[in-house]
Amino acid sequence: MKLIACLLSILIPLSSPVAALPPTQAAVTENTALRWYVKRNLEHRVPELPAEFSSLAEYDGYYADLNHPGEKVLYLTFDAGYENGNVERILNTLKEKNVPGAFFILSHFLTANPALVERMLSEGHTVCNHTARHRNMARASDGEMRRELTDLETLFRERTGREIAKYYRPPEGSFKWENLAVAKELGYDTVFWSFAYADWANDRQPSPDAAVKKIRDNIHPGAVLLLHPTSETNAKILPYLIDLLQNEGYRFGTLDELTGRREK
């Protein structure tokens, strides 16, 4: 037995254990379900774009102003699904401060609040497409995606006599590249964001102080801010926040400026 063990030790080559291969990330295809996020920082720099979103520009997608690096311009955008009195307060502040906003609306918001939509338009704000029904667009077929955009387009035209601005934002940031290809085909730029925070739950609102700190800590030149206009906190802090940011040298731009549409 000792002889056999000795022979085996000679015949079997000595080597280090083979290291396990690192796990590979699944390839992102046009049909991969994605959820928007960015890698924020506290140095007031444009957040880093995660690798899975590297194709964004190919689909006419935006999340921050990368065309004017370092310029202290901000973009206020609001996802408006319904009204609880605070959308009107937000509009009052924007009018008082002479600041433009972009409102991404649903069909329900338009049918329930036609006067507010007319006010947005008459006061120079951009009214944009947040889809007709606020579905998870990562699960939508090409045809369903197309209908979500065109149904709201048609309703908007019927109710206002105007065309909705060709800016699209996926509900809850859920999407797949196939969606954005359809949006691009229909003439839309897709607008994500570089800053958002937990402001949507009416029964779990952040305190005004905490909200201002969160925004100020994460602000950066070229930021696209996503705010929910139903938020009581947002309605309270917006006048102060605008003054604060303007005093720090920021100004507020429009989505046409962000995307370069006004320059075309």
Where would I find each of the regions flagged by the language model?
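Short catalytic/ligand-binding loop motif for oxyanion handling, primarily in non-cytosolic enzymes
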Residues: 175-178, 233-234, 261-263
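N-terminal pre-catalytic segment of deacetylase/amide-hydrolase enzymes
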Residues: 5-77, 83-96, 210, 241-244, ...
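Catalytic grooves of carbohydrate-active enzymes
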Residues: 219-256
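Metal-dependent polysaccharide deacetylase catalytic core of the NodB/CE4 family, i.e.
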Residues: 71-74, 84-86, 91, 95-209, ...
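Hydrophobic alpha-helix-in-membranes signature
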Residues: 12, 16, 165, 169-170, ...
